Amino acid sequence: ALVEAGAVAGKVDITINESLPRIAQKNIEGIMPKTNARINFKPIGISLVIGPFNFPCHLANGQMVSSLLSGNSVIFKPSSKACYCAQLLADCFEAAGFPEGVISMIHSDRHGTMDMVKHPDVKVIFLTGGKEAGLRILENTYKDLTKLISLELGGKNVSIIHEDTNMELALAE
């Protein structure tokens, strides 16, 4: 828990420091003869963050902070295996002074989650989870070209293998 708490705090710093310059208004001079341009980034709507059971705060936190920095509100749907961690994360956002309704945490089963995925006001969907859940999201959203979908499916961590390792066991894992 201590490692994840440190990772959450570090992720906030990195996300803020790296994201703010990228989303700042940009003026581009001389884009064409006698023509200048300005790029403005605007919020697009509600972000639905479907959190994982492993690193339940760290991974969801990065997606939530990015959405908030972009001016979007967030619905956080944590894993049912990490409800307490999710509540602590929601409490941190509340303690930081975010207005009511900017971040909402909703616990639901897969049917309730799919209702949120399909809702027309939800414009960004982040899932860190399994292939089956990712396929369900794609099956329910592929016709709505206004939604941005980010799926991180079944990522694996790097393993360090020492000389005395049981290779058959290590490769199976």
Predicted regions, residues:
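Long amphipathic alpha-helix in the N-terminal Rossmann-like dinucleotide-binding domain
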Residues: 1-24
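Hydrophobic packing residues within well-ordered alpha-helices of enzyme cores
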Residues: 12, 86-89, 116, 137
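Conserved small-residue-rich beta-alpha loop and adjacent elements
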Residues: 28-99, 168
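A structured beta-alpha segment of the ubiquitous adenosine-cofactor-binding alpha/beta core
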Residues: 36-37, 104-123
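Periplasmic-binding protein-like
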Residues: 65, 124-128
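Residue-level signal for inorganic ion chemistry
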Residues: 71, 103, 125, 155
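Short beta->alpha connector loops at strand-helix junctions that form conserved
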Residues: 72, 77-79, 107, 128, ...
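ALDH superfamily catalytic-core signature
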Residues: 97, 124, 132-173
